């Protein structure tokens, strides 16, 4: 089957987990892993897996533009702001897994979130990918006036990039809650839990609504959970939604697939699984366009 070439920039936890997911794709051919530390575990694993590896960062794409049509950026918000302009000049489709928010926000569980005509899209944050679908579901039936989310992740699953981006995480997730989730006002908090053994990713979503309808909200939440589970099987409700006046609280748990980090790192898994799904939609579109072009030439 025809595949579209891709590269990953960023050989940390997220980039390495994404590498293992891309290996299974039927429409994306991972061609290279790019980092800046030759001793990083991600570059070592990529080399062992047979991928071309580079330790000179974005320069690898500049020097070898044919490496990839789709570039996944798993570096940092600061680095992506520089990468974005370069990759735009090189006409690469960019899927940004940092909180840079350079391109429009994308959450694959939200079907009216059109993005295939964009060159650069942003995957918001791990907390955003877990919670924004629920905010969106509630808003669709009850009009969310305020939404607050608390994402709790194992400290062991948070690499240096995640730790350096805490401020960007809260700002970008807040924006995503409002712009994609539909809440009039949003707030986001992240907690790194050092507990041993490491805990699974847990998310709490608190919404105040204008039009309380417990039955409709309950059904909307369950439908959205099932939709997210189509690409993140470990995504689940920790308990049934709680209702109190005009307020609804939802408790989620995300267990990772264990592709790179152990299953407690659901925060990595939901981010990379969402990025894979978005990348495959872009790849499918590219393949379809190439087929149409060949057919038109044949005519």
Swiss-Prot record:
Q: Report the active site residues.
A: 126 (acyl-thioester intermediate)
What does the record give as EC number?
Answer: 1.2.1.10
UniProt key word Ribosomal protein: no
Keywords of this entry: Aromatic hydrocarbons catabolism, NAD, Oxidoreductase
Q: Which Gene3D superfamilies match?
A: Dihydrodipicolinate Reductase, domain 2, NAD(P)-binding Rossmann-like Domain
Record field: catalytic activity: acetaldehyde + NAD(+) + CoA = acetyl-CoA + NADH + H(+)
Positions binding NAD(+) in this chain are: 11-14, 157-165, 267
Q: One GO BP annotation here?
A: catabolic process
* SMART domains reported for this sequence: Semialdhyde_dh (SM00859)
Annotated Gene Ontology MF terms?
acetaldehyde dehydrogenase (acetylating) activity; NAD binding
- The answer to whether the entry has keyword S-adenosyl-L-methionine is no
Q: Which family does it belong to?
A: Belongs to the acetaldehyde dehydrogenase family.
Q: What is this protein called?
A: Acetaldehyde dehydrogenase
Tell me which species this is from.
Bacillus thuringiensis (strain Al Hakam)
